């Protein structure tokens, strides 16, 4: 009978470990009536986060240690991401005026609140179709994002502002309570923190690259448009006059649709000769 009871108890704990929160509540060596000590404002405070310590009544199990590691790494990663995001945002705020000048989307918007397409340019590319075919070009252009309507001009903040909040403090039942548990917590919270900081840097770098690509790609479209190497989007306008019902009234109601998206002009006979500092090909 004792063996059956012991077997059932172990099975319950094993199943509960599939859910991290359930495991810590069901299989903890102590009751979850503790007070959280510390906060998540910096790495040192994170490392020393714990519940008010009580004497350990039994040796910590491997499953409990693994659960503690998982929570420490998860909380550490979220806290590190939020901390690094705040640092990045402080730098962005100090340089806001310069960024407003560099990434001024108002200068490249099209009529009718249309955002230009994003183009990318490649130079001197080689493409090997097969062992007997090699394709060479001096320059290549590609539309990677098409024109579309917006209600407000894009801003650099839409791309690179880091909006990551600090995680909530975990319940005391999920925190280390003994010296042995605090050693585990400190080690894996530090690993999680470092991962979170690296993740924040990676996210920012990716977003900055996307901002630069989109802005330069829209500016490239405007230059090629002047040369006749790409077409404008065609916007059809329908005047609806006065519309509405007993609850809403719309005066001079208009409906706009993009009926033709920009296309690259592959006929060089339609390119225009213009004076430009850009080295893109023009018709002579």
Question: What residue spans do the PLM features occupy?
Answer:
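Helix-centric, low-specificity signal for extended rod-like, repetitive segments
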Residues: 1-2, 77
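Bacterial N-terminal signal peptides that target proteins for export
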Residues: 2-16
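C-terminal motif of bacterial Sec signal peptides marking the signal peptidase cleavage site
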Residues: 25-26
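N-terminal Sec/ER secretory leader and immediately downstream segment
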Residues: 30-156
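Mature extracytoplasmic/lumenal regions of exported proteins
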Residues: 114-284
């Amino acid at each position: 009978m004792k063996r059956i009871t012991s077997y059932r108890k172990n099975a319950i704990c094993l199943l509960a470990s599939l859910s991290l929160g359930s495991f810590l509540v069901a299989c903890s060596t102590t009751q979850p009536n503790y007070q959280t000590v510390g906060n998540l404002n910096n790495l040192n405070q994170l490392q020393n986060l714990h519940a008010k310590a009580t004497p350990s009544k039994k040796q910590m199990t491997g499953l409990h240690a693994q659960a503690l590691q998982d929570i420490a790494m998860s909380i550490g990663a979220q806290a590190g991401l939020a901390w690094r995001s705040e640092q990045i945002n402080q730098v962005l705020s100090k340089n806001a005026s310069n960024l407003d000048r560099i990434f001024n989307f108002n200068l490249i918007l099209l009529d009718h609140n249309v955002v230009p397409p994003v183009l990318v340019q490649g130079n001197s590319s080689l493409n090997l179709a097969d062992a007997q075919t090699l394709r060479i070009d001096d320059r290549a252009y590609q539309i990677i994002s098409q024109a579309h309507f917006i209600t407000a001009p894009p801003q650099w903040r839409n791309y690179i502002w880091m909006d990551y909040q600090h995680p909530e403090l975990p319940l005391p039942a999920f925190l280390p309570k003994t010296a042995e548990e605090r050693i585990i917590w400190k080690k894996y919270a530090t690993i999680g923190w470092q991962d979170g900081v690296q993740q924040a840097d990676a996210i920012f770098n990716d977003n900055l690259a996307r901002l630069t690509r989109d802005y330069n790609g829209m500016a490239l479209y405007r230059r090629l448009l002047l040369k006749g190497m790409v077409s404008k989007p065609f916007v059809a306008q329908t005047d609806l006059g006065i519309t509405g019902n007993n609850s809403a009234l719309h005066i001079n109601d208009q409906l706009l649709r993009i009926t033709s998206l920009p296309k690259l002009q592959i006929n060089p006979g339609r390119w225009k000769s213009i004076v430009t500092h850009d080295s893109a090909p023009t018709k002579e």
